[in-house]
Amino acid sequence: MTIKVHHLRPAPGAKTTKTRVGRGEGSKGKTAGRGTKGSKARKNISAAFEGGQMPIHMRLPKMKGFKNKFKVTFQVVNLERLAELFPNGGQVGPAELVDAGAVRKGQPVKVLGTGDLGGVTLQVSAHAFSASAKEKITAAGGSITEL
């Protein structure tokens, strides 16, 4: 027999009816499971109240400082990666790096000086360069352009 949606039933005991409290003298009537007297028996008590214990929101440290909304985060590319991606040399800019899969588009690019160019001559244009990257590119006979 195939199972059909209209044959499905919840497991026995899976669905229980909600207990209505404070309705008559039976179970959960009168005091509705709150005991007698005291602040917890009366109107409302804060969800953050932990019975006099120092609450978690006061035990945790305050977050210090602020987030600078003008901060520029660069995508970094090292010289060794440039030498891998462009072994024949030539023009290298953000568009070429996006096409090569080295960076994502829409964010500024910074070239860092880790690794060696291995004699590859590159004309690199990027938004920022480290000092060591500038030295190594120009020493290999290439040129740099800051965008």
Swiss-Prot record:
Q: Which cysteines are joined by disulfide bonds?
A: none
Q: Where is this region: Disordered?
A: 1-42
List the GO terms this entry assigns under cellular component, sorted alphabetically: cytosolic large ribosomal subunit
Q: Which UniProt keywords apply?
A: Ribonucleoprotein, Ribosomal protein, RNA-binding, rRNA-binding
- What InterPro entries does this protein map onto? Ribosomal_uL15 (IPR030878), Ribosomal_uL15/eL18 (IPR021131), Ribosomal_uL15/eL18_sf (IPR036227), Ribosomal_uL15_bac-type (IPR005749), Ribosomal_uL15_CS (IPR001196)
Q: Which GO terms describe its biological process?
A: translation
Physiological role: Binds to the 23S rRNA.
Per UniProt, subunit arrangement is: Part of the 50S ribosomal subunit.
What HAMAP family does UniProt report for this protein, alphabetically? Answer: Ribosomal_uL15
Name of protein? Large ribosomal subunit protein uL15
Gene symbol here is rplO
